[in-house]
Amino acid sequence: IKPLAGGEFDADLLAIVDPVEGWEAKDYVNKLGAFFEGHSIYKDKVRRYSHCVTIEYAGERRIDIAPCVRGRQWPDTYEVCNRASNTFETTAALDYTKWVIGRNGVAGGNDLKKVTRLLKYLRDIKTNFTRPSFLFTTLVGLQIHDWDKDTAAFADTPTCLKTVVGRLDDWLQMNADLPEIRNPVLRSDIQSRVWDQTKYSNFRGKINLYRGWIDEAYAEQDRDESIGKWQRIFGDNFA
């Protein structure tokens, strides 16, 4: 899905590195930034953020590279580096990626990946609710269970979209107050911390609204009417 005008194609890269004696958390990000800033190709395209170095190129493309230190204190542990606070933060990024891939495998046809992209696109074109991509990925993934594999609820991408948004809306409507939404592979990571009650309530209301629109578009038998109803959700260029 091409980003909206002024938007960017972006990619996230986790760079697994061994610990360097004497380095603090900020050093890993700063050294990575300095490396690219010293390169003739990248020097004018680099920006440093709290956890990553960003390279912007080709006008509408960017890549975020985050150093992740392996085994600094204990074997098989991973930590990302917060340059702003100069602290190491435990992460389970590799396990989280495996979890997402597993949920996508249950849905089949790469449909979870497609649905997640559609919902992120919906966020970007409507601009009336906010949620970080990692939190939405978790919320979507939690709606898919092992027993869903090869069921009619995930027969194709539109059906997967209807099923996932319907289940998500059902869960949201049962939780009027902001719940704790934890990383499914790192229980100490409360991902919902990025929301307050106001943002959560707005998200809850918008998903309920769009759930109704999706159900209506999905059920429409007339082709032209169906296209019009999908365009109400995803914009006039969606067909």
Label for each model-derived stretch:
Residues 113-216, 220:
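Conserved nucleotidyltransferase catalytic core and NTase-mimicking acidic/glycine-rich helix/loop elements
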Residues 29-78:
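Conserved catalytic core of two-metal-ion nucleotidyltransferases
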Residues 21, 105, 126-127:
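Second-shell loop/turn segments in exported
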Residues 3, 61-117, 187-190:
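Extended, alpha-helix-rich binding/interface surfaces that flank or overlap catalytic cores
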Residues 212-239:
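Charge-biased C-terminal accessory regions appended to nucleic-acid-, cytoskeletal NTPase
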Residues 8, 12, 50-52, 60-64, ...:
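Extracellular structured ligand-interaction cores
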Residues 1-22, 26:
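Active-site nucleotide-donor binding segment shared across nucleotidyl transfer reactions
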Residues 24-31, 111, 160:
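Short amphipathic alpha-helical segments
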